[in-house]
Amino acid sequence: MANYFNTLNLRQQLAQLGKCRFMARDEFADEAGYLKGKKVVIVGCGAQGLNQGLNMRDSGLDVAYALRKEAIAEKRASWRKATENGFKVGTYEELIPQADLVVNLTPDKQHSAVVQAVQPLMKDGAALGYSHGFNIVEVGEQVRKDITVVMVAPKCPGTEVREEYKRGFGVPTLIAVHPENDPKGEGMAIAKAWAAATGGHRAGVLESSFVAEVKSDLMGEQTILCGMLQAGSLLCFDKLVSEGTDAAYAEKLIQFGWETITEALKQGGITLMMDRLSNPAKLRAYALSEQLKEIMAPLFQKHMDDIISGEFSSGMMADWANDDKKLLNWREETGKTAFENAPQFEGKISEQEYFDHGVLMIAMVKAGVELAFETMVDSGIIEESAYYESLHELPLIANTIARKRLYEMNVVISDTAEYGNYLFANAAVPLLKGKFMDSLQAGDLGKSVAGTAVDNAQLRDVNEAIRNHPIEAVGHKLRGYMTDMKRIAVAG
């Protein structure tokens, strides 16, 4: 199999990278109707598998789970989760031949084996669904021509997909039809019904492509969503402790600081996040973010280039073939860091203190979000896709750190995201550790910015620069569909 994207000519590559249309609410008037009365079989019962299945069943669909024989015989976690929630469970051979839609929600590294196992069992004219297009785009999986291949990609972890549905809402979602596999022209109808069944139509749906979803998803998770949070956590903790800050306080400031800071980002974009600072602190955060963007732009561009070319995917798949040697080593190294092993702080940190004492962290968020967005757009990805894969998902990932530090983030995200996270963080930490971190001033981290003097013209220009960044305009539009967003921060 060959990387699908690399088999396309330049015009085709650009067309698929740039495929992005924000769908109108009335396009989902039939909601999940197209799939009602049909059999949906989900392969895999992890976070996305279970929670999407629960939503689909509550939306009136006939949902069952196909698991490997050994998973059923040994009553593994996937079998227990499916049966405890009242779903029908069977082997591939028992359930796949009956399915109108087979939804593959296993980890990326298992996709080829799963697809090759289920394809011969699928009836003529059935549909195959994904929630991430890595197997189609990067692996280049060939699917039988009578099978329709679609994607519904919620832009949140599986737990959030369920919680938002239970609240009568949903999470923003990308949908796509593989152009090589839509023999009956029903792919979009299937994808729309599946998205509606998970509740995604209530929060906004983008009609995208497998290519655009994969390339933007990989870029977001490697850089701002995971890599920048990991690098920032390690750098900020070590800096605070080296300057005499109590390790427990430093740990709590960082662990819960990302979540508190990005809650403002979620509600009102970079503008609101920066507005939580005093005017002197805002000016300092802006200056630091501009420095960070200049230093890190080549690193962000390298990650985007390696994602576009397939270099990243080929490297990761080589590690799969080597029993995840690099991934497991990086995971072990992260577990040994001082931040991960710091004592817990029993005291209280107020919400505003996280902002006042986290000017550098705010600068890192601003720089990372803007760089990820700009780099994706410069590579042909449409602004709406770039927004969802940078700013939108950041509070959700920050929330995982608030639960159990970097360990929890790396457990919750996919192995693909975790691998890319380590690649980025392992380069970003030494890049920033020396000259930049050594140049920090009192008030950048762990203390409030001193002084009150502000130049009006400078403040005016900085405010205009923040509010006029393209991500703020597209964010304002997309957040209009998410007016019922719940508050997720739990800092204290």
From Swiss-Prot:
Coiled coil: none
Annotated TM spans: none
Sequence ranges assigned to domain KARI C-terminal knotted in this UniProt record: 209-344, 345-485
Pfam families: KARI_C, KARI_N
Enzyme kind, highest EC tier: oxidoreductase
SUPFAM superfamilies: 6-phosphogluconate dehydrogenase C-terminal domain-like, NAD(P)-binding Rossmann-fold domains
Task of the protein: Involved in the biosynthesis of branched-chain amino acids (BCAA). Catalyzes an alkyl-migration followed by a ketol-acid reduction of (S)-2-acetolactate (S2AL) to yield (R)-2,3-dihydroxy-isovalerate. In the isomerase reaction, S2AL is rearranged via a Mg-dependent methyl migration to produce 3-hydroxy-3-methyl-2-ketobutyrate (HMKB). In the reductase reaction, this 2-ketoacid undergoes a metal-dependent reduction by NADPH to yield (R)-2,3-dihydroxy-isovalerate.
Name recorded for this polypeptide: Ketol-acid reductoisomerase (NADP(+))
Organism: Yersinia enterocolitica serotype O:8 / biotype 1B (strain NCTC 13174 / 8081)
